[in-house]
Amino acid sequence: KQKFLKVLYENFYKSYNPKAADRLGVIYTPNEIVRFMIESTNHLLYKHFGKTLSDKNVDILDPATGTGTFITEIIENTIPKQDLAYKYKNEIHANEVAILPYYIASLNIEYTYKQKMGYFEEFSNICFVDTLDNTLPMSYGKQTNAFSLTSENTERIKKQNERKISVIIGNPPYNANQKNENENNKNREYPEIDKRIKDTYIKNSTAQKTKLYDMYSRFLRWASDRIDKNGIIAFVSNSSFIDSRTYDGFRKVISQEFNELHIIDLKGNARTSGERRRKEGGNIFSDLIRVGVAVYFLVKKEGENGFKVYYNVINDYEKAEEKKEYLKSHKLKDIDFAHIIPDKDNNWINLAENDLEGLLPLYDKSNNHNSLLNLVSIGVSTNRDEWVFDFSEKTLLNKMRYFIESYNSKV
């Protein structure tokens, strides 16, 4: 039922408003991903904090809920019936920026609750708001749509902002830019979040051209600021943060803000070619997007020092259905993760070999007393190269004779 509803919504939205669908990243999340993320989050919650998603004082937020997929899965298969009424009323939260999925999510969540509990209860913790505008504690949502300004919705946002969020889980939009400038379909600006990105991720980057205003970068920055002092962020998104040069500052910053990271790299990057493209395999979103995808879990623990990265990558050449089956048949605790130790340049994979840095340099411009050579020159160089090649052999021979004769006449 969930898959049917999500596919129906996705196809309708793309036909009804294709630009909004593209800008908002309207792609439904496969159930295999949703269940794996929820089960893994539950495992990490218990491992690190001795709690589960069904416990009191564990507030859960889906910041880009779409049709409510993550919330309905939590209600239907994660929280026991005896705990659900309290969680539903107080500690499960969802945000949605578009009116159509907002209504679908509300109905979907309420129907799932009724099916499990046997009676209807309005879900009053879903907010019609652009999460990225809700930059605590500066505002209770700056969205200009009139619906967001109703007193009921404003009170919902205010109530959510007063909660300490322990788990942020979901599938944030990935689409960073339209395909070309003529599409007139750019993502809007978010001054507060973009400033936070500039002051953190970009400030700590060594890349000459660093553009980190992708939607998923914004949601990661927002979630990192919103999560409680003890909590977990569980996202599925573009995987470029794993090895992209422009994300070196991001990798450095999260090592300072979090204590543990688990990554399952699902590959699927279609923006490659040749053998590399074949190794990437199918995209787990049924090849509806072209970027590589990763599922990851960030753990934040108050008073704990250090940062550990655990990395698992899917096998080469696997099809989308094989990747879904991998998530369906594996538990996070049973996955064979590699413990990654970042290098000095904040690389996680494709680590740089730094052995040469300890050797005596041939020449050091800044300190020639600590080098093998103390003089340097540009060596043999050529000039007037156009004199020594030509399309005609006869013309070339004539040029060279003239060149040699001219030189000898000056000696």
Where are these regions (language model features)?
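Sequence-level detector for compositionally biased, low-complexity segments
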Residues: 124, 163, 180-182, 203-206, ...
